[in-house]
Regions:
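Intrinsically disordered, low-complexity segments
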Residues: 237-267
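A surface-exposed partner-binding patch
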Residues: 1-117, 172-239
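Alpha-helical bundle/repeat cores within regulatory domains of eukaryotic proteins
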Residues: 159, 166, 175-177
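Compact, glycine/acidic-enriched structural inserts
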Residues: 117-159
Length: 267
């Protein structure tokens, strides 16, 4: 079994290589630092890797505000609004918003299930990941995923239906970067018009706007792609195991090779 690195030296290395160098996302220096009360409040609740990132950057934005580390206490009303009345495929637990995008996509961390829930407030969709939740029993994976929550950041991917450009890029050019307590929001909201046009965007108060979106539309649970991938892997393993006893070793290998070729063509 491979021993995966997970200590704070690895966390710092991943910050440098994945976030600052590969993504090229420099911190804006526009947020605020994390006080000792936050570290004390979340010590033992969140991985040490998360607390390290907090101490390293504070609640700051990156790449002209495309991505923000969030204060989970400030963002608690938004989380509550989106989870209210929503049946999740996880045990009951407290969820915290650890980061978000310029347009309000949020990555939530469950105290039991970890980074197993993303929220898309524009489409009204919550995306679960049972695969991530399953890793939380492993201390090493918990620490690594705490780091990856920030070094593999969420990105706004909506395209302007007229220009074909990323909506967030057009918004930054026209409106400037959003601040710590701001998001870009459509007026009227997308859930009312279905129009994805950057010209309809304005700068909104983040908490008020995202709570409004939670109350203005039905919430839907998106497909858990991690569960689907696990089912496919299990089915492949079952199929491979079922074929080999049927004939000679050569026949079994040939059949397995054909199956692998078909699978590669499909995926």
């Amino acid at each position: 079994m491979i021993d995966l690195p997970w200590d704070l030296e690895w966390v710092e290395s991943d910050i440098q290589e994945s976030l600052l160098e590969y993504e090229g996302w420099s911190p804006m220096g526009a947020g605020h630092g994390v006080g000792g009360e936050h570290v004390e409040r979340f010590s033992g609740v969140l991985p040490e890797s998360v607390l390290y990132v907090w101490r390293r950057f504070g609640f700051d934005g990156f790449a002209d505000g495309r991505f923000w580390i969030t204060d989970p206490l400030v963002w608690a009303p938004v989380v509550d609004a989106w989870l209210e009345g929503t049946a999740l495929p996880f045990p009951d637990q407290r969820w915290w918003c650890l980061n978000r995008t310029a347009m309000g996509d949020m990555q939530l961390w469950g105290e039991i299930s970890g980074p197993a829930l993303d929220v898309d407030p524009i489409l009204g969709t919550l995306w679960p990941s049972a695969g991530d939740a399953a890793d939380m029993d492993n201390f090493v994976m918990r620490e690594r995923m705490g780091c990856l929550t920030f070094t593999s950041p969420l990105k706004d991917s909506f395209e302007d239906e007229v220009s074909g450009r990323l909506v967030v890029d057009e918004a930054i050019e026209r409106l400037g970067p959003v601040g710590e307590g701001q998001v870009y929001g459509f007026t009227p909201a997308y859930c009312f018009t279905g129009r994805m046009e950057a010209r309809l965007l304005g700068v909104e108060d983040a908490i008020a706007h995202l709570v409004f979106l939670a109350q203005a539309q039905d919430h839907q649970l998106g497909q858990d792609f991690s569960a689907a991938a696990a089912q496919i892997a299990a089915q492949i393993a079952t199929d491979d195991g079922g074929e080999s006893p049927g004939g000679s070793g050569g026949d079994g290998g040939g059949s397995g090779g054909d199956g692998g070729g078909d699978g590669g063509g499909v995926w």
